[in-house]
């Protein structure tokens, strides 16, 4: 089985359906004997340029190990799901399990905020 990195963007009005979509897509990978190595829900983010007059979208990143037929099935699901604005499926050489730069940046912001609050409390 090959390793793939999958990113898809969902219409912002359909954000509440994203967990169900993720569950459906991960279930199809696991049913075929594949494995999900990394799953990140980046949430609603600003688009670089408008798509269908939209300026925001809900982003999801998945790193999976799956047979080609499952990837073809996912691609078909993305194509015929009106809620999915864009998708990208890239073949990778190995499984990627470390956190993406998006998550690392978010974690560092949280750590900075916590440190700032602690320093303010210590200064009182």
From Swiss-Prot:
InterPro entries referenced in this protein's UniProt entry, alphabetically: Ribosomal_bS6, Ribosomal_bS6_CS, Ribosomal_bS6_sf, Ribosomal_S6_plastid/chlpt, Transl_elong_EF1B/ribsomal_bS6
GO MF assignments: small ribosomal subunit rRNA binding; structural constituent of ribosome
GO biological process: translation
PROSITE patterns noted in UniProt: RIBOSOMAL_S6
Coiled coil: none
Keyword tags: Ribonucleoprotein, Ribosomal protein, RNA-binding, rRNA-binding
Cited CDD domains: bS6
Domain of life where this protein originates: Bacteria
Cysteine disulfide links: none
Family: Belongs to the bacterial ribosomal protein bS6 family.
Name of the protein in its database record: Small ribosomal subunit protein bS6
Organism: Actinobacillus pleuropneumoniae serotype 5b (strain L20)
């Amino acid at each position: 089985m090959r390793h793939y990195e999958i990113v898809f963007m969902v219409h912002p009005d359909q954000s509440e359906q994203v967990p169900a979509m993720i569950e459906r897509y991960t279930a199809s990978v696991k049913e075929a004997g594949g494995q999900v190595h990394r799953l990140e829900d980046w949430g609603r983010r600003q688009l670089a340029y408008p798509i269908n007059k939209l300026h925001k979208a809900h982003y999801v990143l998945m790193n999976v190990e799956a047979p080609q037929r499952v990837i073809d099935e996912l691609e078909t699901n993305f194509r015929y799901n009106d809620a999915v604005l864009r998708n990208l499926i890239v073949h990778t050489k190995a499984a990627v399990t470390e956190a993406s730069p998006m998550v690392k940046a978010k974690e560092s912001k949280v750590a900075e905020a916590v440190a700032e609050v602690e320093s303010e409390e210590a200064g009182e």
